[in-house]
Amino acid sequence: AVLDWELCHLGDPMEDLGWLCTCSWRFGNHAMPVGGFGQYDDLFAGYERASGRAVDPERVRFWVILGSLKWGVMCCGMADTFESGNDRTIERAMVGRRASENEIDLLRHLLAI
């Protein structure tokens, strides 16, 4: 397992599940909505078993959408950092160009409402 602390904060536990299910982490494997490797039902059942907390799929969906927006804003920030010359690494350019993926993902969510 990998523990990523850069966005650590107190909040709704459903946010963590939503972040894992954000489209950006599927890396093209859209048939597997959980990080590109699993299904919602399996994630929710495993989470409930391990935590003793009930999963609210609608709250997770909210966090999936907000996670996509949040990642899109971060991608735009990285693109700006690259374009301004403050960080000309290939990593900044590559992540920055992913902002458009989030725009498409958010439009798909809006169409599904």
Model-predicted segments: where are they?
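Active-site acidic catalytic loop and adjacent metal/ATP-binding pocket
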Residues: A1-E15, W19
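Short amphipathic alpha-helical segments and their helix-coil junctions
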Residues: V2-W5, G38-D56, A99-L106, L110
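Short, conserved loop/turn and helix-capping segments at secondary-structure boundaries
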Residues: G11, V34-F37, A93-G96
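Active-site activation/catalytic loop segments of kinase-like enzymes and analogous catalytic loops
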Residues: M14-G52, L66-S84
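Short, surface-exposed loop/turn segments at secondary-structure junctions
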Residues: H30-A31, P57-R59, G85-E91
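All-alpha amphipathic helical-bundle segments outside canonical DNA-binding/catalytic cores
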Residues: A54-L66
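Regulatory N- and C-terminal appendages and interdomain linkers associated
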Residues: S84-I113
